[in-house]
Design a protein with these regions (language model features):
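Glycine-rich adenosine-cofactor-binding loop
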Residues: 111-114, 118-167
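N-terminal ligand-binding/catalytic initiation module
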Residues: 1-106, 115
Length: 169
């Protein structure tokens, strides 16, 4: 069977494929899933002071690697400090299923974990995280955390990557 080109999502499409509430519920489920394997990330120094990060993970449904670079001086050049992708594979046949925008995955995952923590530690029947105005976050992460705190969604995806692979975007 010929290999199909994987779905390649840009930043906006990646964000649409990973709604905060659903992502938070998936994180909750993955934390309880014994099939999840996340080895230590590899950080490779680059010429000029940057770093290459390789972060593999897998569970019973997907295998994936987040591959990003961090170059602190990039913003002065008009480039993002963090660039990269998350590549999701089918563990049964090794085919790439989807390529997600790495910085968007990182920002949304981090905010979803904060949302999950707030909902777990201070549950609110209305489904919104209480005291979100008092959350502490870096200037770069703060907008993502606010969006997550205000987000509403339903249900848990079978996995964030699987959801993205099935998304029409």
């Amino acid at each position: 069977m010929p290999l199909e080109k994987p779905l390649d999502l840009n930043a906006s499409e990646t964000a649409l494929a990973l709604p905060y509430q659903a992502l938070a519920e998936c994180v909750r489920a993955l934390l309880q899933d014994d099939s999840v394997r996340v080895p230590a990330r590899i950080v490779q120094p680059l010429q000029g002071g940057g770093s290459l990060f390789v972060m593999p993970a897998c569970d019973a449904q997907v295998a994936m690697t987040k591959l990003i670079t961090f170059v602190a001086g990039n913003p002065a050049q008009g480039l993002p400090a963090i660039q990269g992708d998350v590549v999701v594979f089918d563990p049964a046949d090794g085919q790439r299923q989807v390529i997600l925008h790495g910085p968007t995955v990182t920002a949304r995952r981090t905010a979803a974990v904060s949302l999950l923590a707030a909902q777990t530690l201070a549950p609110n029947p209305q489904g919104r995280a209480p005291g979100t105005a008092r959350w502490s976050a870096t200037a770069e992460a703060a907008p993502w955390h606010r969006r997550a705190a205000l987000a509403s969604g339903a249900g848990c995806l079978p996995g964030p990557a699987a959801s993205a692979a099935r998304s029409p975007h």
